Design a protein with these regions (language model features):
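PLP-dependent aminotransferase-like
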Residues: 63, 67-110
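Conserved PLP-binding active-site segment in aminotransferase class I/II-type PLP enzymes
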Residues: 1-64, 68-69, 90
Length: 110
């Protein structure tokens, strides 16, 4: 059984560069900026923004949508806690919707 890493490109060089630079944050450094530019280009967008976590991304999404005090955000009860947390942090009201037992996705009929 061979459990060695399999690199198909410049992955090892890039990781080594990041470690050597001392800028190991997931949202700083040259590689992060390069990724944002290339991702935006691939998506046909002017800009792209990366985040350090899914929770940070959800916070930003609710803020960008203008979700705030008294707004209702529909979320499934079978989910990660951050969906609930960011809704409450935005002073919005989490509303749990039933899920389809086959897919665990929100059931549109409910």
């Amino acid at each position: 059984m061979n459990n060695q890493w399999r690199f198909t490109g410049n992955e090892l060089k890039y990781v080594t560069d990041v470690i050597a630079s001392g800028e190991g944050s997931s949202t700083s450094g040259n590689y992060n900026s390069l990724f944002e530019k290339e991702f935006a280009k691939k998506c046909g967008a002017k800009y792209a923004v990366t985040f350090n976590s899914g929770t940070s991304t959800l916070h930003a999404a609710l803020h960008a949508l203008g979700v705030g005090y008294g707004d209702e955000v529909i979320i499934p009860p079978v989910t990660v806690i951050s969906n609930f947390d960011v809704t409450v942090a935005a002073n919005a009201i989490p509303v749990f919707a039933d899920v389809d037992p086959e897919t665990f996705n929100i059931c549109p009929k409910e």
